Amino acid sequence: KGFEIDYQTRLWYLPGALNGLVFNANYTVATSTVKYPRTVVSNYFDFDTFTFVQENNDTTYVDRLLDQPDEILNISVGYDYKGFSGRLSMLYNDNVFVNTNFWPEKRETTDSYSRFDLSVKQKLPVEGLEIFLNASNLTKTSDVTRYRGISGYNDNIKLQQYYGQTIDLGIRYAF
């Protein structure tokens, strides 16, 4: 279950240089529940038959859908003027259930995060030629995966990945 709202506008009706402003926003909410299989193994000694008995009880547990954040928000603010175009964007991604497990404390989720990106381009006086700059992950946000329980290091971090920033600067020719 969920919903999505999207709004995009170019503020052409504003006076003067402000009419080059652009704004985009997208918000998604998705809630989910799934039954995951779970087998509970029971062991006991039966004194009547003098045998060791192992029973498998198949059952389920309910949790979120794998790889699906509950909320996603994208916002970008930009400016377009003649051959210039620039955008600053923000992505918010809620935590994500990424791994199911028999033991609840071993189930894994990612941390929620926000990331900022910048994109700028300028058309040059030659037909089809432009210069561009793309900068991703300006705040150097990392991806963190956590166990729902406590790990051996007295925290619940399973994995932390650092991607850093990436910046692309170039000249593009389209013909």
Regions found by a protein language model. Give the residues of each.
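Outer-membrane beta-barrel architecture
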Residues: E4-Q8, S76-G78, S119-K121, N134, ...
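Extracellular loop and loop/strand-boundary signature of outer-membrane beta-barrel proteins
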Residues: D58-D63, F102-E108, N154-L159
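C-terminal beta-signal and adjacent terminal beta-strands/loops
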Residues: Y92-T100, K121-F175
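Residue-level marker for the onset of beta-strands and adjacent loop->beta junctions
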Residues: K35, L73-N74, F116, L129, ...
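Gram-negative outer-membrane beta-barrel transporters
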Residues: K1-F97
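Short, local alpha-helical segments
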Residues: N99-P104, S112-D117
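Residues that define the transmembrane beta-barrel architecture of outer-membrane proteins
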Residues: K1-F3, P69-L73, S112-F116, Y163-I167
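Surface-exposed coil/turn segments at beta-strand junctions on protein surfaces, enriched
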Residues: G16, Q68, Y79, T109-D111, ...
